[in-house]
């Protein structure tokens, strides 16, 4: 599909509504206005008039907005038709527009993609549009808006600019080796490099917070049957999301709940009780439980406190611990403290966190909530933050690695050429965030996840 085509799509959600909006962008948008409206509206003024069919009869009436390029969202000529939000009406109007030559249905995210290609947005800002639409909390929405307004891009561009100046200095030292002053060893380059590394570390810290806001934390509740896993899911969710009985093996499939702890999304997964099962349905549920455990950010190892006094997970169930993926964080949750009389709270046992609570009464659950928030390093007091994606974290990590490699070359061998190459690679990694250096495949993956009308 060509970017020279004129595209059209519904910009409002499908289904019935008070208002339905069709968006048209491209060279033929002017022709669409002439054919459907009978005239070209005054730029950036709301015009109330009928929307006409091929034979001149009215299909609907509403507001038309005309944004001639380059002063539009996409940078192209853009026409918006705001009519009644009935699916039949919008479908008739869409079919009418598609009868015109050179007009086609937009691909998902194509309006935002054209805005990016026409330098109306950088890539991080374009992604922020989708993140703002998908925001699951007020804090996530505010951070996504900050990204859309350029907060994240400004931080990245500052780093790129600092690297550009540093590269100029290093290249000069390489090109003029006969100067009386040895620029590579006089300490100035090292000082500037340390400054860039410190600034990058600060951006990475904020980006990790932004990623938590966007992606959340996947927590799997696992343990033996009847340990209270479903009761804990209900306590964390604040509602009866799972069936709770005294019958072992009640939960046979994976149950998912999405909650927020002070703005941080938490994806809680309740799993079937782990045991050697002869029942085929239960056996499948247990296999699914292990699949979820292997993909978790943290596992809550649920223990029935009435069955054992052990607190070390290796003593409680060594086979379970042995099967866990290496380096997967676990929190031991000793349940039924209301029966055992154990002191509620959190402690450390052989490097593992141990929480004592009662899922049935809810006592101690707030301690667990706070522990989950702290274990992910989530800071609820960070103001003016931005949202970040996993690809952003990866790009920042790659840039940091190149800078550390460059510093090692500088201090170890005064190797200016190798330092210059590491600085170039770091700059390239950062530029991938804003799209100044990005492959077509990556662009395709990013924009294909957008809404059709975006």
UniProtKB/Swiss-Prot annotation:
A molecular function (GO) term: GTPase activity
Reported cofactor(s): K(+)
Binding site for K(+): 226, 245, 247, 250
Gene Ontology biological process terms, A to Z: tRNA methylation; tRNA wobble uridine modification
Residues covered by the TrmE-type G domain: 216-377
InterPro entries tied to this protein: G_TrmE, GTP-bd, GTP-bd_TrmE_N, GTPase_MnmE, MnmE_dom2, MnmE_helical, P-loop_NTPase, Small_GTP-bd
Enzyme class: hydrolase
GO cellular component, one term: cytosol
Pfam families: MMR_HSR1, MnmE_helical, TrmE_N
Residues bound to Mg(2+): 230, 251
Annotated cofactor note: Binds 1 potassium ion per subunit.
Subcellular location, principal: cytoplasm
Annotated positions binding GTP: 226-231, 245-251, 270-273, 335-338, 358-360
The enzyme's E.C. designation: 3.6.-.-
Family under the similarity heading: Belongs to the TRAFAC class TrmE-Era-EngA-EngB-Septin-like GTPase superfamily. TrmE GTPase family.
Assembly behavior: Homodimer. Heterotetramer of two MnmE and two MnmG subunits.
Protein name: tRNA modification GTPase MnmE
Source organism: Salmonella paratyphi B (strain ATCC BAA-1250 / SPB7)
């Amino acid at each position: 599909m060509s970017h020279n085509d004129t595209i059209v799509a519904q910009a409002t959600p499908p289904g019935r509504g008070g208002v339905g909006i069709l968006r048209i962008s491209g060279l033929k948008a002017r022709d669409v206005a002439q054919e459907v409206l009978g005239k070209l509206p005054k730029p950036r003024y709301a015009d109330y008039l009928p929307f006409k069919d091929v034979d001149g009869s009215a299909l609907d009436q509403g507001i038309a907005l005309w944004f001639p390029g380059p002063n539009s969202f996409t940078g192209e000529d853009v026409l918006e038709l705001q009519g009644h939000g009935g699916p039949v009406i919008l479908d008739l109007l869409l079919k009418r527009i598609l009868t015109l030559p050179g007009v086609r249905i937009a691909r998902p995210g194509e309006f935002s993609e054209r805005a990016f290609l026409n330098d109306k947005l950088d890539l991080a800002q374009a992604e922020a549009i989708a993140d703002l639409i998908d925001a699951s909390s007020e804090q996530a929405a505010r951070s996504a808006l900050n990204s859309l307004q350029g907060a994240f891009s400004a931080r990245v561009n500052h780093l790129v600019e600092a690297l550009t100046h540093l590269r100029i200095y290093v290249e000069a030292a390489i090109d003029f080796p006969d100067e009386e002053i040895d620029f590579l060893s006089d300490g100035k380059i090292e000082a500037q490099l340390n400054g860039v590394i410190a600034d990058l570390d600060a951006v990475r810290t904020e980006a990790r917070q932004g990623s938590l806001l966007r992606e959340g934390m996947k927590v799997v509740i696992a343990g033996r049957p009847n340990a209270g896993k479903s009761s804990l899911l209900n306590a964390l969710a604040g509602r009866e999301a799972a069936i709770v009985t005294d019958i072992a093996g009640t939960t046979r499939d994976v149950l998912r709940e999405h909650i927020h702890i002070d703005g941080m999304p938490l994806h809680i997964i309740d799993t079937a009780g782990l045991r050697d099962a002869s029942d085929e349905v239960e056996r499948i549920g247990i296999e699914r439980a292990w699949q979820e455990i292997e993909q978790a950010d943290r596992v809550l190892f649920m223990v029935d406190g009435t069955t054992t006094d052990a607190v070390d997970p290796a003593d409680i169930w060594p086979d379970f611990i042995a099967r866990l993926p290496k380096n997967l964080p676990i929190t031991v949750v000793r349940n039924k403290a209301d029966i055992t009389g154990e002191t509620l709270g959190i402690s450390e046992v052989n490097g593992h966190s141990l929480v004592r609570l009662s899922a049935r009464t809810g006592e101690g659950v707030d301690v667990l909530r706070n522990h989950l928030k702290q274990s992910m390093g989530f800071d609820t007091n960070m103001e003016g933050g931005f949202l970040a994606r996993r690809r952003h974290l990866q790009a920042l990590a790659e840039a940091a690695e190149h800078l550390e490699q460059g510093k090692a070359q500088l201090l170890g061998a005064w190797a200016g050429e190798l330092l210059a190459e590491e600085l170039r690679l770091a700059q390239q990694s950062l530029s991938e965030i804003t799209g100044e250096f990005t492959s077509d495949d990556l662009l395709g993956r990013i924009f294909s996840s957008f809404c059709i009308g975006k």
